[in-house]
C-alpha cells in the first residue's frame, strides 16, 4: 500500500455520518481501514486522502486528522478489491458494519465497478531510513 500511483477498479464505497448520539472517531476509521486491508483491499482512500503504509489517522481536539489534514463528516471511504471479500468481511459477525451500526452511526455501503483512487500526493518522509542507497 505505497499509494504512489492512481488506481481504478471494482470495490466498495462507504459513507459514514456523525449523528447527535454518536460521533465518528479515528478509532472507527482505523477499524474500518484494518478490516478492509484484512479483506484484501489493494487501495483505500478516506475523503480523497490516499491511505498508505505510513498514514496517520488521529483525533486532535475532537477533529480527525489524516496525515495532518483535517477531515470531517460525512466520511467517504473507497476501497478497491474483490467486492465479495470486502463486503463479506465488513458484514461478518465481528465486522465493521455489524459492530458500528449498533452504535447509532449512519453507515451505507455500495458495491461499485469503477472506483478511482488518486495517488498519495505528498512527500513520503522516512524518519530512520533512506531511499538513497
What residue ranges belong to the model's regions?
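Core subunits and conserved enzymes of cellular information-processing
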Residues: 1-133
Amino acid at each position: 500500500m505505497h499509494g504512489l500511483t492512481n488506481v481504478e477498479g471494482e470495490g466498495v464505497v462507504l459513507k459514514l455520518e456523525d449523528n447527535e448520539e454518536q460521533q465518528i472517531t479515528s478509532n472507527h476509521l482505523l477499524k474500518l481501514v484494518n478490516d478492509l486491508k484484512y479483506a484484501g483491499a489493494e487501495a483505500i482512500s478516506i475523503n480523497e486522502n490516499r491511505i498508505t503504509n505510513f498514514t496517520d489517522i488521529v483525533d486532535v481536539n475532537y477533529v480527525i486528522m489524516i496525515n495532518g489534514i483535517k477531515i470531517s463528516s460525512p466520511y467517504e471511504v473507497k476501497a478497491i478489491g474483490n467486492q465479495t471479500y470486502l463486503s463479506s468481511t465488513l458484514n461478518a459477525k465481528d465486522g465493521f458494519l455489524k459492530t458500528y451500526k449498533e452504535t447509532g452511526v449512519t453507515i451505507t455501503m455500495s458495491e461499485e465497478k469503477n472506483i478511482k483512487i488518486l495517488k498519495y500526493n505528498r512527500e513520503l518522509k522516512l524518519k530512520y531510513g533512506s531511499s538513497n542507497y
